[in-house]
Amino acid sequence: AWVTSAHRAIQALNEKYGGGFYLFFRRPAFSAQDEKYMGWERKRGALTELVRLLKRKSTGLRTEVGEEDWLREVTYVITLDGDTSLNVGTAREMVGAMAHPLNQPVVDGQRRVVTSGHALFQPRVAVELEAANRSFFSRVYGGLGGVDPYGSTASDVYHDLFDQGTYTGKGIFQVEAFFTCLDGRFPENAILSHDLLEGSYLRAGLLGEVE
């Protein structure tokens, strides 16, 4: 029943807004280590399989709703977690930064790593005003909620010194560079925290003025 409901919801969005919404399903894979069927390589596998789909490669991801032909034109992918939302205009600013000539990634084909430019950008991440006071934990660790108009002038040590920031799983990456550098790169059932690794190979940059 939930599959049918999902179909109807996505189709309704496409009818209302003229297309652009997709519904994907991942084929479960048996994990001998966990002794159960699950998404291959968890979230890291989800990104890998999405990129493989965009590149017309073998993947456990299938398109249930939406035209696959349009997917071949996808150049960038924006990654968000379930507890993350985009501010108005953030997506446009991230795409603009990725498309800037000075930021174009240069990939070492032999080492399969970005050597200059950036194939991934990490924007500033802040706690929403409402969420900052939702619990004692968020009040302690979340700091001040909302958008900070003055913090945009602050620097980041990693990016300032090495022209390379850290990636925490929320940002934008170039599909071509991701596929070249990361597809089949890591052993299975060995990595849970994959964000920093991906950011290192793709030479993540920090968008300090984008939140």
What are these regions (language model features)?
Residues 1-211:
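Internal catalytic domains of large membrane-associated glycosyltransferases
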